[in-house]
Amino acid sequence: MEQQRIEVVGKLGSTYGIRGWLRIYSSTEYAESIFDYQPWFLKIKGQWQPAELESWKHHNHELIAKLKNVDDRDAAQALTNVEIGVDLSVFPKLEEGDYYWHDLIGCQVVNLQGYTMGTVSEMMETGSNDVLVVRANVKDAFGKQERLIPFLYEKVVKRVDLTTKTIEVDWDAGF
């Protein structure tokens, strides 16, 4: 499996009990959704390796999981802090105007006046809407290092072109 086709969806946490269970830290929109995306791949020593989910459950306010062939605390402890990835092909297709964060990260952001504001370095979730975190160009004319631009499709974000990796926004470069 090619590494560039894998998207990180979470991380294995500390062990739970003595039978190989691990805490799961999900970075999916709904925490339990991490279990819908199968098969999992674990990044061990820089390489993605397949892993089979045997079982999962809620425990208090946490998610815990049991992986096949991880049968004791020592085996589980060796996987603590390992990233969980899935092949991008398992993600459902989205409707027009909806985008996965991993598709937006790395896009150039240009305002309506044609000024290149920088590159999307990450996404942030707020209570009301997602926010583009845009790392400004080194010699930004406005002295900015970073811009936070709300991802409000049609209001602020006018166009997203994933083939050219550009996002056009109605946003003042001075902000």
UniProtKB/Swiss-Prot annotation:
Record's keyword annotation contains Cytoplasm: yes
Listed GO CC annotations: cytoplasm; ribosome
GO biological process: ribosomal small subunit biogenesis; rRNA processing
Protein localization: Cytoplasm
Annotated PRC barrel domain residues: 96-175
Record Gene3D superfamilies: PRC-barrel domain (2.30.30.240), RimM (2.40.30.60)
Transmembrane segments: none
GO MF terms held by the record: ribosome binding
Superkingdom of origin organism: Bacteria
PANTHER family referenced in this protein's UniProt entry, alphabetically: RIBOSOME MATURATION FACTOR RIMM
Annotated family: Belongs to the RimM family.
UniProt cross-references to NCBIfam families, sorted A to Z: 16S_RimM (TIGR02273)
Domain comment, as recorded: The PRC barrel domain binds ribosomal protein uS19.
Subunit structure: Binds ribosomal protein uS19.
UniProt cross-references to HAMAP family, sorted A to Z: Ribosome_mat_RimM
Protein name (Swiss-Prot/TrEMBL): Ribosome maturation factor RimM
Originating organism: Actinobacillus succinogenes (strain ATCC 55618 / DSM 22257 / CCUG 43843 / 130Z)
Lineage, top ranks: Bacteria, Pseudomonadati, Pseudomonadota, Gammaproteobacteria, Pasteurellales
